[in-house]
Amino acid sequence: MSLTQIRKQELMTEYQAHETDTGSADLQVAFLTERITQLTGHLKANPKDHASRRGLLKMIGRRKRLLSFINAREPERYQALIKRLGIRR
């Protein structure tokens, strides 16, 4: 259920701040958003999978904290990121 290497590379080229960026907050939010999307689809097909639901809620909380971090420091970067990711917030 994790991200494939190919998809991870695609996300990295799209969201990384510079060539050697592997863990910026923007990139982490992009990875989490992709995994959240995958897990949401999984849970629609498997509604009784409570362990995955708990993992999904943890990921959503982590993404929320990262977005709050970005918003506190650079609100315009935050707005651009949520617009690019299509996150309604």
Curated annotation (Swiss-Prot):
GO biological process terms, semicolon-separated: translation
Signal peptide start-end: none
Keywords: Ribonucleoprotein, Ribosomal protein, RNA-binding, rRNA-binding
SMART domains: Ribosomal_S15 (SM01387)
Example of a GO cellular component annotation carried by this entry: cytosolic small ribosomal subunit
Molecular function in Gene Ontology: rRNA binding; structural constituent of ribosome
Family annotation (InterPro entries): Ribosomal_uS15 (IPR000589), Ribosomal_uS15_bac-type (IPR005290), uS15_NS1_RNA-bd_sf (IPR009068)
Top-level taxon of origin: Bacteria
The keyword NAD belongs to this UniProt entry's keyword annotation: no
Keyword DNA-binding applies: no
Record CDD domains: Ribosomal_S15p_S13e
Protein task: One of the primary rRNA binding proteins, it binds directly to 16S rRNA where it helps nucleate assembly of the platform of the 30S subunit by binding and bridging several RNA helices of the 16S rRNA. Forms an intersubunit bridge (bridge B4) with the 23S rRNA of the 50S subunit in the ribosome.
Assembly and oligomerization: Part of the 30S ribosomal subunit. Forms a bridge to the 50S subunit in the 70S ribosome, contacting the 23S rRNA.
Similarity comment: Belongs to the universal ribosomal protein uS15 family.
PANTHER family named in the record: RIBOSOMAL PROTEIN S15, BACTERIAL AND ORGANELLAR, SMALL RIBOSOMAL SUBUNIT PROTEIN US15M
Name of the molecule in the record: Small ribosomal subunit protein uS15
Species assigned in the record: Synechocystis sp. (strain ATCC 27184 / PCC 6803 / Kazusa)
UniProt lineage: Bacteria, Bacillati, Cyanobacteriota, Cyanophyceae, Synechococcales
Gene name of this polypeptide: rpsO
